[in-house]
Amino acid sequence: MRFKRSCSLGVAAAIGMSVLAGAAAAKEMTTGLSFDFNRNDSGFTPIFSDYPNEQGVEEFYELRSGHEEVPIAEAGKGLFLSGNNHSDDLFMGYYKELSGLVPETEYQFNVRFQLATNVENDMIGIGGAPGESVFVKCGVVSEKPENSLDSLSHFRLNIDKGTQSQSGADMIVVGDLAKEEINRPGEYEFNEIETKVIARTDKAGTAYLVIGSDSGFEGITSYYLDDIYVSWANTSEVSVTRGDAVKMLFDHAHRWDEAVGTPTFTDVAWDAPYAEAVAWAEQNGYLGGYGNGFFGPEDMMSVEQAMVMIYRLFGSPKVTDAGVLDSYKDASQISPWARDAVAFSITNKLLVPDGKILPQSPISVKALRYAIGQIGMAD
């Protein structure tokens, strides 16, 4: 049995944007690539980092990579990585150039891959567990991943991957190396991992997919990457689920010292990537459910729902210029409970409609990121 671990939308770029949001509604248009590695490595390049620049260090750290057979029946070949974490912070991974995209454009990348590991969960190791203390990370960046030497003559990446359990601006934690199923103790099994990240292409329309591990376990770690699939869409053309939307607001506005309980909705699993965000929104009254205990985390967030959520974050201030809605022909489509929120959002330029408000339509990633990025600037 294969377990799919899903992660919510990772904001790999700064959430504030200098461009206007444009149309708020999303129109889904995606392009993708898949790699099974049965014939070759498909152009993926291995990279190791966070270790000293010393003679013979690659041998001492036992750094290995290659296009090899995955030790699982009928799995075929995959990308192998192995290293001995003497530095207590060893990063090892692969990156792949994605070319032919629109230059200097923000995309949402959906990434799915399988990781073959033979590490059982709840094991004890030096510095940390060999499973739960080896953090799997994923990101998409506009700069080719490369090493340089820091002041201590250690190899460091030119991208922000974070440190061990912490995500960085360019890579987010999407899992760990512990097996999710223990059908064959000591043998390799697949963990399936899925995530979403947001990144911007460079001037040539190029981005780089990066998948790897950041280790806190001071020992040998070995694993295989296989069946990597990546798709992308312009953030103005992809919609946001209610769960992901709340998580985006939570990541931007939640205070580190603000206690958060657990969600009471029956359709929000306690370990869902957006569970804490939903609980936070619920306990503060920013966004409710549908009734009967349902939140609908996988439903699309509408434009008016998103504006209500942000409006309530501001404390639902009195709206003195509701007439701002009169200039939009589809203003009559706004639900009564959302009219003040939409008016407030337009007045304060949280929402910048392109001729129409489209209140019932799914909000785009770009429009929601723009609105959240304006928090702190509104009156």
Put a short name on every predicted segment.
Residues 106-120, 213:
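A short beta-strand element within beta-rich, extracytoplasmic domains
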Residues 63-93:
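Surface-exposed, low-complexity/disordered Ser/Thr/Gly/Pro/Asn-rich loops and linkers
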